[in-house]
Amino acid sequence: MKVYDGSQTESPEQSTPERIKVGIAEYKVTTEPAMLTTSGLGSCIGIAIYDTRNTVAGLVHVMLPSAADIDGGNHAKFADTGIQALIEAMADAGASTEAMEAKIAGGSDMLDFSENGSSIGSRNAKKVRETLDEHGVPVVGEDLGGDHGRSVKLEADTGNFIVKSANTDSITL
């Protein structure tokens, strides 16, 4: 930093973390101080998983609860297989499942096409919680439900999960 009295002091350059876009039915993992982002979370859910010990972070954008009735296809599209794929990719990058924590957002009741009155958003939320529990990953923050869309950002170096929606201020989980 330049000081105008003739002296100079050095300060470390502050760099903006890399922005990694996670599309619908995709997941990404990083060990770098990046910002993982996804948008368009209506009934979809963004699941951020962070390893608090090894600084490995991942984000998946799931659309539907279960791949049980689907043969093949994109695993990241479904809560059960998308979360499993994300956890496996994080473990491959050096994460420990014992140190993982999850934060989740989305699951809005945007549309109701079900016969039993249960919306896709609420079924997604239920399956996300069940799947994380099966893998021993606690949910430490969530912003679910409502009737509005969301966008999220995961700060990979801190685990902060920033949720933005049209009708509220940003919140950090």
From Swiss-Prot:
Looking up InterPro entries in the UniProt record yields: CheD-like_sf, Chemorcpt_Glu_NH3ase_CheD, Cytotoxic_necrot_fac-like_cat
CDD domains the record matches: CheD (cd16352)
How is this protein named in the record? Probable chemoreceptor glutamine deamidase CheD
Q: Which reaction does it catalyse?
A: L-glutaminyl-[protein] + H2O = L-glutamyl-[protein] + NH4(+)
Keywords, alphabetical: Chemotaxis, Hydrolase
Which lineage do the record's taxonomy fields give for this organism?
Archaea, Methanobacteriati, Methanobacteriota, Stenosarchaea group, Halobacteria
Family from the record: Belongs to the CheD family.
Tell me which EC number(s) this protein carries: 3.5.1.44
Species of origin reads Haloarcula marismortui (strain ATCC 43049 / DSM 3752 / JCM 8966 / VKM B-1809) (Halobacterium marismortui)
Q: Which Gene3D superfamilies match?
A: 3.30.1330.200
Q: What class of enzyme is it?
A: hydrolase
